Amino acid sequence: QEDIEDYEKEKPKDLMSHFRFMVINYENLLKVGYSLGKNVQKLFPYYQGILSNLKEVASEGVPFYRAVDVFALGVLYSERKEEFLDDLKAIYEQMDHTDGLIEYYMVYLFHDKIVPFHSILEYQNMIEDTYESVAKAQGFWYYSHSDALWYNNHTKDTYKGYWSFDTAATCKIKGIFDERLKDLEYFPYDLLVQGD
């Protein structure tokens, strides 16, 4: 009986650790798969895996860069939003902080509206309705993440690829599909044009 009581006390902690691990696992699978050139529709289940696990631990806090990526990927997969919008909403409702960029993505996903935004990610504020503005902003993308855990991972064995899902999502909302975007470093062009 004592062992069962001990297990019941530890189970929620272990379960939360499991969900956090699974979020990271699915993120890695998605990024590695994309870096290897896998079909973006075949990567969609990994996105769903991120969401289904993240919603279980979102009340503990969602790191800012993870939140931006999760909502940006939602925009990039918006043609399939009926398959994930409930999970994304559950995550959003548990978050204790947000940003104008995340709000921008949410309004687009939930209300099919485009509203002005301001983000703490200054490079995002540089994006207008032109390729040139995106190219300029993208030049700041990597260095703007110098405080991210993955920054400089290309020098370690933990590297999975760097992808600016948020820049691509903003381009999708603004209707910027210029073919020159595929030549920008870190820009996930295949995710941007998958619906075309």
Region locations from a protein language model:
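Eukaryote-skewed repeat-based solenoidal scaffolds used as protein-protein interaction platforms
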Residues: 1-155, 159
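Alpha-helical oligomerization segments
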Residues: 132-196
